[in-house]
Amino acid sequence: MSNVHVIDHPLVQHKLTLMRRKDASTNSFRRLLGELSTLMAYEVTRDMPLQDIQIETPLETMTGKVIDGKKLVLVSILRAGNGFLDGMLNVVPGARIGHIGLYRDPDTLQPVEYYFKMPSEMAERDIIVVDPMLATGNSAAAAVARLKQLQPRSIKFVCLLAAPEGVATLQKAHPDVPIYTAAIDRELNDHGYILPGLGDAGDRIFGTK
C-alpha cells in the first residue's frame, strides 16, 4: 500500500478519537472535523510543485517560491465531503471548489451520479477529492473516474477513515491516485458501515438521522 498515507500526527489522532465518541455533540463533531481537515491539508499539499519568482522585500530584491500552475481544486463528494471544505480552505484559501453527488442504486448497489459541478478549465489542475469515509470505495472510484475525464494534472483522495475494502477498491481502479487518511479501520459491517468507525459522518456533521 505504498500509495496509502496514514497521517499519524498526534493532534490528528487525538482529535479523531474525540470525534469517534458516540457522545460527541454535533457542534463538537463539526468543529473537530474542521480542525482535522486543516491539519490534514498540510500533509496532503506537502508535494505541491513550486516555481521561483522575483519579489521586493522592504530591504531588497530576492527570489521567492510560490505554488506553480493553476489554482488547486477541492472536490467534495456530497454531502459529507462538505464538512472538509472550510478546514482545508484555511490552508489553501484560493482553491476552487467542485461538487459531485452520487447515490447507490438499490438494485445494483453501484453509484449513480445525480450532480456534477466543477470550476471552468479543469485540465492540468491539481484536484483533492474529499469524503470523510472511504467505505466500499465504489463512490470514490466513480468520482475519480469522472474527474479523470477532465484531464487534471493530478488527483488525490482524502478521508478521515478508510476500510480495507475501500482502500482495495480505489487502488485497484485507480492505482495512480494516492489516498490520505487519519486511520484504516478493521472492516465493514453488513450495512456498509466502517468498524469501529464513527457512525454516519453526514448525519453527525449536519445533525440529521
UniProtKB/Swiss-Prot annotation:
Pathway it works in: Pyrimidine metabolism; UMP biosynthesis via salvage pathway; UMP from uracil: step 1/1
Cofactor note: Binds 1 Mg(2+) ion per subunit. The magnesium is bound as Mg-PRPP.
GO molecular function annotation: GTP binding; magnesium ion binding; uracil phosphoribosyltransferase activity
Positions that bind uracil: 194, 199-201
Keyword Lyase attached: no
Pfam families named among the record's database cross-references: UPRTase
NCBIfam families membership: PRK00129.1, upp
Protein name as it appears in the record: Uracil phosphoribosyltransferase
Organism: Acidovorax sp. (strain JS42)
Gene name, Swiss-Prot/TrEMBL: upp
